[in-house]
Amino acid sequence: MSITIRSATNAARVVVTVTPNPALDQTVRVAGLALGAVNQAESLEINAGGKGVNVAGCLADYGIATIVTGLLGREGSEAFETMFARKRIDDRFVRIAGRTRTNVKLVDPARGQTTDINLATARATAQDLAALEARLASLAAPGRWFVLAGSL
């Protein structure tokens, strides 16, 4: 199934998703997680994430032209770049010094429990925020839709 967003003039639209604080989502499955003990992981999954990144991925899956922007740490950006290339998402993130935020999910399927651990994010400077503001201004165009999503 393919969905295309069209205006009254039948021109295809572009959606810009803005994710100020994207995250690498690490999901670790551990059956019978025991706190204070050594546990053996069953699996590890790492995905590019953040609300706006997830929205962009879904839109791209439906064939909708999508641009992503926000602030992305230079360290840990590879998973995002790979996803954007694979899904043909136009990457316009402003790269900033530091590591992209990581969120760890510890999933215990035996108990049906999930524990979330959210790590700190790279700190944006005034120059980073000015660069993002300029990027947003450059992306503003008639017929473009913007989705602002996620945490600051």
Locations of regions flagged by a protein language model:
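Conserved N-terminal subdomain of the carbohydrate kinase-like
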Residues: A37, D61-W145
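Short glycine-rich anion-binding loops that position phosphate/pyrophosphate groups of nucleotides
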Residues: N21-A23, R99, A120-A122, S151-L152
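Short, basic, glycine/proline-bearing loop/turn elements
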Residues: V38-S43, A120, A149-S151
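Structural motif
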Residues: V16-V18, W145-A149
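Glycine-rich phosphate/adenosyl-contacting loop at the front of the ribokinase-like
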Residues: S2-T69, E78
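Intrinsic disorder/low-complexity segments
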Residues: T9, L59, S138-A141, G150
